[in-house]
Amino acid sequence: MKQPFILTLVSSVACAVTAANKAPENTTPTKSKTPNVVFIYADDLGYGDLECYGAKNVQTPNVNRLAKSGILFTNAHATAATSTPSRYSMLTGEYAWRKEGTDVAAGNAGMIIRPEQYTMADMFKSVGYTTAAVGKWHLGLGDQTATQDWNAPLPCALGDLGFDYHYIMAATADRVPLSLIHI
């Protein structure tokens, strides 16, 4: 006999609280400000290498400032141990080991991510963000490997993958060609 009474009592209180917390009729909706997103993706950077994650040997005050006003990821895992497949997976959401040709790219590799693939940059653009990539790219450029004219516009570049702006290195500083590409 007590259980139906308690259930009725709890339900009644829940309904009363919900009704009492109703928003006033004349409120104007507030426009939410879209946050800036800075996604830092670095090679050979471990969890314990930044001060904001507990590193003691290196001071990283600028990263600490960004971390203090943003989000710290504390349970993230790389999909691959090397740069090209890891970057591919992060930008496309696909496991690189499931796609042929996503191992470590040569400096003159053709673009591994194809323009018809949906990328993280496409996702951000679809909700109004302006997107940029700066630094080491290492996912290939141009239509085919070893056919790029590094002195001319590339036929297949980051603009085709959803990026509005880019200032990148084609691969790494220790591979040829060492080309800085700016759009």
Positions of PLM-derived features:
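Formylglycine-dependent sulfatase
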Residues: 2-8, 17-181
